[in-house]
Amino acid sequence: MDSAIKTQFDRCEAEGLCRSDVAGLRMKWIPGQKHLIAQYHPTWQLVKRKASFQKPTMTQPFNPDGFNFTKVKESEVLARVYVKDRKVVFVRDSSDPLPEGVDTLYTILLNVSPICNNHQLLVPNLEKCYNQVWRYDLTENWIVFCENSERDDYVLFFNSLCGFSSVNHLHLQVMYSSSFYATATGSPTLPLPDDFTPSKLPLEYADCRVLFKREFVVCLEVKDWLSQAIKLSIEHDANETAEMGDRKRRELAHCFNELIRACYEQAFPYDVVFCQHGSDIYTFIRRYQQPLEDLHVNPACVELTGVVVYRSEESFDRADQDILMEECKKVVYFEPSIWDDFVRSYVNRIVNN
């Protein structure tokens, strides 16, 4: 799956379709025990896409007059696929009918301002123009995308409205964590975790505490990170049957969907990360989007994983873990009592049903 799409990504780069080139990215380690990465590209200050809204609500309707993916050129399409029988299947002709039982065609688009190699967008049923609101019926399919990747560093990202989504047209982003480490200058602060690997994001080394365990799913709270967050995790056995894998995927999707429903009920913006072949899902539950003005950082999904995109060279050069943490706790975090009530309510929601 990944290699076929990478071929098309390379074609787009060669044709000059990207506003910024991956080779021009500057990356470096940020000193500190969290092993954060800072990233900067000079062109990001020069080219900006107009926002399709100023102050969105979490369920803002789709706006056909704002930027949306129906306006993307065919040359920026990397592939079209659907999900069937636990597999991601490529479509040769978009006019061909989908197989019986399949109702979602995913268009894979070039991200024209890539922050890693093969940075892509996944848009379900592009022409139906869903707004950027989670569709619970697609959760298991997103997990299948992760399961089908050839690579251990495949990561799916989602920013909700009010959580720094810049386009109100339903989409997820695909990135590869090893790309963030490949050209980072300097050295990570020692000691590195024993299980350190480029196939993990900085977030994945954060301390967690267990909130509950179900038959297959473990729910954990991420501690002392850039955002308050919940981690849902399953473990796969190499010898498990396909039916057992389906049961685990369903339970994981159920626990995740209930978490997202709780976010919408409380009007709490959120950002999501699917990683480790879909076995782990992190959800950042955060306050309404607000930039870290002094640092020139928008704390969206990628930034909250520990890959911090700076919008000014000066801020990039001065990147500091402690200052970043302090600012995130002011801008992104809920008050402890609000957060504790939310977590308690979610745990009761799952455990008692």
Where are these regions (language model features)?
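Active-site microenvironments that recognize anionic phosphate/pyrophosphate groups
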Residues: 1-142, 177-240, 249-353
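Secondary-structure boundary elements
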Residues: 143-155, 163-166, 178-183
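A short glycine-rich, hydrophobically flanked beta-strand micro-motif that places a catalytic Asp/Glu
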Residues: 152-166, 170, 267-277
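Short beta-strand elements
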Residues: 172-174
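A general "terminal functional-core" signal
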Residues: 242-244
